Amino acid sequence: MKTNKNLQHVKIDLERDSAYILERHCLINYACDCPWARKIPYEKYRANWFSNDGQQNGFLSAITESMKDPRTIADILKDELGETIGYLWVPFHGDDPDFVWADVQEIYVEEAYRGMGLASYLMGYAEEWAKKHGAKVIRSGTGCENISSQKLHQKMGYCQYRFEYEKVLK
């Protein structure tokens, strides 16, 4: 599959797409969560996440608020047959033209489409969009055990700029 041809970016419509992006958001969170949280089987993690309305509402509020900014990327990616193959959410931050940055909050490629260069395509797309819309920097985060995402970031020329720590309390 040529990743830059025959792909369609469709703006997220929360009435139509909220179930899809909530499911993928939960999968992304699990893949990027800390080691102790990932000891929980995914189905239990998912059940806990979806039982907390605050989690869902917080995420939907954040994406809704970010979409008020026309620079934000909030796209569902579809193939030439109209099948959903992933999604990308990249809000912008900063009002000072000398310090505007884009933040790759979520990038997701459906399992059946992985290994085809789509994640690289989406990251490249986000970078070009960010440059075109005045960002000086693009940021993206991942979990400490999400090796495939770390490799993608390294391949795309991203460098680590911060560490986060946690302590399991007993």
Spell out what each predicted region is.
Residues 1-43:
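Conserved N-terminal entry element of GNAT/NAT acetyltransferase domains
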Residues 20, 24, 58-62, 121, ...:
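Alpha-helical elements of Rossmann-like donor-binding domains used by nucleotide-donor carbohydrate transfer enzymes
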Residues 106-109, 115-128, 132, 147, ...:
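Conserved acetyl-CoA-binding loop-helix of GNAT-fold acetyltransferases
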Residues 114, 140-150, 166-168:
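Conserved beta-strand-loop-alpha-helix junction that forms the acyl-donor binding cleft
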Residues 130-141:
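Conserved GNAT acetyl-CoA-binding A-motif
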Residues 154-163:
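Conserved acetyl-CoA-binding loop of GNAT-fold acetyltransferases
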